[in-house]
Amino acid sequence: MRIAGKGADLLALSRLAQVAGYRVRAQTPDAESAADLQRAGLCVEHLTTSNDLPEIEDDPYTAFVLMFHDLDWEVPLLRQALEGDAYYIGAVGSSRAQSSRLEALQLAGVKNTDRIHGPIGLVPSMRNASGLAISTLAELLSELQTHHLKAAA
């Protein structure tokens, strides 16, 4: 699982996913978030600029979750994710935020935006980091099962 973002939402989902047995690759431009993730024993990749993202290798078993509220990071990270094979691509935020995000992606010439889940999570409108993490992980598990059942058929 690849999770990009900053703050409590990033930390909560990364920790929960790790406990659930996922191999987590957390990406953040925020030094404080990076330090929190490292203290939790998570693999952290420090993002320095949205114009020079590290190479990725998302495969059909990878979920990519965006835990940002910043279009300067969202557009390049989602463009990159959409170029890969991740079975799930999702972004935190309200329906209004998702509409703004999709509009920004279209203006940037990004295709296949229908692959982006948003708002993320099985339980709508989660306001705390732990609840959002649980709701998001549940959605990822459901999507993984559905995706791989379709692939096997």
List PLM regions with ranges.
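SAM-dependent methyltransferases
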Residues: 1-4, 10-23, 63, 130, ...
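Hydrophobic, well-ordered beta-alpha structural blocks that scaffold small-molecule cofactor pockets
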Residues: 1-59, 73-77
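Alpha-helix N-cap/loop-to-helix initiation residues
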Residues: 10, 71-74, 98, 125
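Adenosine-phosphate binding glycine-rich loop
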Residues: 92-153
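Short phosphate-binding/catalytic loops that engage adenosine nucleotides
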Residues: 22, 86, 110
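ADP-ribose/adenylate-binding Rossmann-like module
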Residues: 63, 68, 79-104
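Hydrophobic/aromatic beta-strand patches that form the interior of the parallel beta-sheet core
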Residues: 25-27, 45, 63-65, 90, ...
